[in-house]
Amino acid sequence: MHFLAFLLCLIPLALCIIEPRDIDGPTSHEAPTDLPIDWHILSQAAGMAHEPYCLFGDIGDRVGDAEVLWSKGHGVVIQRVKIFHSKSLGVTVSFEGTTASLLSILHDVNAALIDPPKEVAPAYCEGVKLFAGFSNAYMELRDEVYEQIVKFQKQFNDKRVTTTGHSLGAAMAVLAAMDLNKRLDDGIYRSFAFGMPRTGNGAFANDVDKKIGGRFFYIVNGRDWVPRVLPRELGFQHPSGQIWINPPSTTHWKYYPGQENHYGANSEDPILTFEDYHGIYSHICLGYGPGKCPASVGTVYLP
């Protein structure tokens, strides 16, 4: 918990070196709807999003309908990543959120908007800018993750590929989804980003909508502050696909269509604590400390 408090203190420093600009994208005023996806699928994705936080146990562990197939990293030099085969979501890659590692924290505060690295540039339209630290974190794992995904697709004869993650891992999940959607013959199947910070500019948000819209969802728990950073006034913009759990850590969830929906999570001020950040998403408690290891699916009672 202390390292996240430290991170929260560093964010104002990062903001000081970024030039304010006009809001770079639309604000949706569409009314919320029921979920466009079965909540059991969200629960399965949340369980796999939590599993990289687990330090012990690994290959062969079961998380709901999925089995851990491969793991790399310890959250110190690179973010931990795990690959599963899930009966409902196919070959699934899950990225770890922020850890106590200085390098992990530096990924979070390296908040410049940069051009996509040349290796992933073909996945994006012109004008896209990415959060530098999140992009760097993904690039450190990109090639090996791709090799493992292709191997497991063949092993299980399963073309479906899903990405997921929490916090920093959620940002990596959407970057992976865009990259893999270009690299894989059949694109991606689904992408779920829990507690995702804003990861790029308006062109990025539009590109996500265009290329993986309807397959990408980001989930906000209550007044979690992480999805509110960095501010839109600094050129950052969420894509469409918001599912808002409100009140937090309950089964009261709705889908908020369009980008930065006026009636969604932006309608309430963030709470600068970690209760909602480390909250319960679709019956799964996510994050270091409160989350169960190994991860489980659908085991937390919700009001």
Swiss-Prot record:
Its main location: secreted. This is Secreted mono- and diacylglycerol lipase LIP4. One of its GO terms (biological process) is lipid catabolic process. Disulfide bonds join 54-293. Belongs to the AB hydrolase superfamily. Lipase family. Class 3 subfamily. GO terms for cellular component: extracellular region. Its EC number is 3.1.1.-. Coiled coil: none annotated. It is an enzyme of class 3 (hydrolase). It comes from Malassezia restricta (strain ATCC 96810 / NBRC 103918 / CBS 7877) (Seborrheic dermatitis infection agent). It is found in: Secreted. CDD domains: Lipase_3. It catalyses: a monoacylglycerol + H2O = glycerol + a fatty acid + H(+); a diacylglycerol + H2O = a monoacylglycerol + a fatty acid + H(+). Residues 1-16 form the signal peptide. One of its GO terms (molecular function) is metal ion binding. Keywords: Disulfide bond, Hydrolase, Lipid degradation, Lipid metabolism, Metal-binding, Secreted, Signal. Transmembrane segments: none annotated. SUPFAM superfamilies: alpha/beta-Hydrolases. The active site is at residues 167, 224. Secreted lipase involved in Dandruff and seborrheic dermatitis (D/SD) probably via lipase-mediated breakdown of sebaceous lipids and release of irritating free fatty acids. Shows activity against monoglyceride and diglyceride substrates. Due to an absence of fatty acid synthase genes in Malassezia species, secretory lipases are essential for the yeast to generate free fatty acids from degradation of sebum and assimilate them as lipid sources for growth. Plays an essential role at the pathogen-host interface during disease progression. The lineage of its organism: Eukaryota, Fungi, Dikarya, Basidiomycota, Ustilaginomycotina.
